């Protein structure tokens, strides 16, 4: 094998590994209950593949805290992350209810309709409401 073939084979292997890493990223990771900030994150592998995920944690004061925490996780997997926006989530597991609303002052408003679709993959038996009202 010449250098070009070795390089090409190595790049294909790296790309396959990043595709597998992307496939392993959960679509939803949010706090089990309460009202908290959330961000939508576009997770991107080394090529053109990407997926939008939802992250929201009650222990994070700022939307940027959530993004920075998750960005580090994705970097360790060889993935990039971009944040198109955020908002708030009200999570009531007893009532099987989620409400998505508001916006992030730093990142802007996430697409709440898309957020609802993503949340429904993890919470198919929940009532999920979206609103553009409130902060």
UniProtKB/Swiss-Prot annotation:
**GO CC, one annotated term:** cytosol
Q: Which residues bind substrate?
A: 37, 104-106
Keyword Membrane present in the record's keywords: the answer is no
| Gene3D superfamilies per UniProt | Janus/Ocnus
**Signal peptide positions on this chain:** none
Q: Name one GO molecular function term.
A: protein histidine phosphatase activity
What InterPro entries does this protein's entry cite? Answer: Janus (IPR007702), Janus_sf (IPR038596)
Q: Keyword Cell division, does the record have it?
A: no
Return the SUPFAM superfamilies for the record. PHP14-like (SSF143724)
Q: Which GO terms describe its biological process?
A: cell differentiation; sex differentiation
Q: Name one Pfam family in it.
A: Ocnus
Name the active site residues: 63
Keywords carried by this UniProt record: Differentiation, Sexual differentiation
Please explain the role this protein plays, according to its UniProt record: JanA and janB regulate somatic sex differentiation.
Similarity annotation: Belongs to the janus family.
**Name of the protein in question:** Sex-regulated protein janus-A
> Where is the organism placed in the taxonomic lineage, from the top?
Eukaryota, Metazoa, Ecdysozoa, Arthropoda, Hexapoda
């Amino acid at each position: 094998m010449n250098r070009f073939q070795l390089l090409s084979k190595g790049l294909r292997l790296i790309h396959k590994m990043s595709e597998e890493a992307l496939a392993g990223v959960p679509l939803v990771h949010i706090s089990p209950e309460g009202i908290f900030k959330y961000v939508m994150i576009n997770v991107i592998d080394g090529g053109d593949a990407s997926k939008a995920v939802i992250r929201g944690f009650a222990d994070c004061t700022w939307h940027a805290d959530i993004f920075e925490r998750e960005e580090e996780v994705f970097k360790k997997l060889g993935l990039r992350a971009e944040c198109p926006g955020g908002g708030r989530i009200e999570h009531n597991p007893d009532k099987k209810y989620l409400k998505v609303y508001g916006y992030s002052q730093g990142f802007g408003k996430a697409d709440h309709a898309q957020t609802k679709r993503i949340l429904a993959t993890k919470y198919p038996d929940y009532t999920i409401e979206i609103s553009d009202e409130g902060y």
